[in-house]
Amino acid sequence: MKKISLTLLILLLALTAAACGSKNESTASKASGTASEKKKIEYLDKTYEVTVPTDKIAITGSVESMEDAKLLDVHPQGAISFSGKFPDMFKDITDKAEPTGEKMEPNIEKILEMKPDVILASTKFPEKTLQKISTAGTTIPVSHISSNWKENMMLLAQLTGKEKKAKKIIADYEQDLKEIKTKINDKAKDSKALVIRIRQGNIYIYPEQVYFNSTLYGDLGLKAPNEVKAAKAQELSSLEKLSEMNPDHIFVQFSDDENADKPDALKDLEKNPIWKSLKAVKEDHVYVNSVDPLAQGGTAWSKVRFLKAAAEKLTQN
């Protein structure tokens, strides 16, 4: 009788454990969403076979993908470090990440150790670098061109199962753009606005569809200065050229990391008599770091933030 009771007790405990295991498995399944499987993904006319959805993503070189991850709340397995650390801008998504190297200096050995399902690299990398990175796993070179911002975000959304969220972000941006564009046209339609970036103590301007210009001129429709229209890439400018353009509004982007050798470059600029003579300066229409200075300008995150800043700054008296 005792043997039967003991057997029943063991059986009961086994069934309870199985039930708990099943429940935990079910909970884990719900938390992870759809079961991962190999799928073919189309991105900029190329096909990649990847495991989706996945959070085993290593980002190297593509700050654009880091910004998309921030907007979609994706926490990658590996992320780009800046001067050996993750900057505050990305602290909310790098809590589980290991560094994959600096922006243009990928650590291939470290990425290999991670064994990621997919590596998001950058089209800025030379072909030889991309070949080396691809030895660590399936590698997708993510475009650094502003006009591909939607495709870039949808790529990460497909990899992580967040397509619905990405589509809503795009739809919300386009709706906000319509409303803000109307307000700006009423207030600043004929105003001249310029975005400059200070790097290594020098002043740079960008082509009409590059950096934040893609939003300022491309989306909002403000007229680009001739110097911006003529620029073919990041272009060194000067105070004398700024004086010739004499914009009504100036957006200044200044990062300490990019001016480590000349930390007082912005202060020195602001003291310069030519700078002080500019219309935008006289009218207090100079906006320093209205968006985080590490932002790439042509991503969904950058566009959403810059649109908000432009709406505020360009419609003020």
Swiss-Prot record:
UniProt KW Cytoplasm keyword: yes
Disruption phenotype: Strains lacking this gene show a reduction in growth stimulation by the catecholate siderophores enterobactin and bacillibactin.
Pfam families: Peripla_BP_2
Signal sequence extent: 1-19
Physiological role: Involved in the uptake of iron. Part of the ABC transporter complex FeuABC/YusV involved in import of the catecholate siderophores bacillibactin and enterobactin.
Lipidation (N-palmitoyl cysteine): C20
Naturally occurring in which organism (per UniProt): Bacillus subtilis (strain 168)
Alphabetical list of PROSITE patterns matching this protein: FE_B12_PBP, PROKAR_LIPOPROTEIN
Domain of life according to the entry: Bacteria
Protein name, UniProt field: Iron-uptake system-binding protein
Keywords assigned: Cell membrane, Cytoplasm, Ion transport, Iron, Iron transport, Lipoprotein, Membrane, Palmitate, Signal, Transport
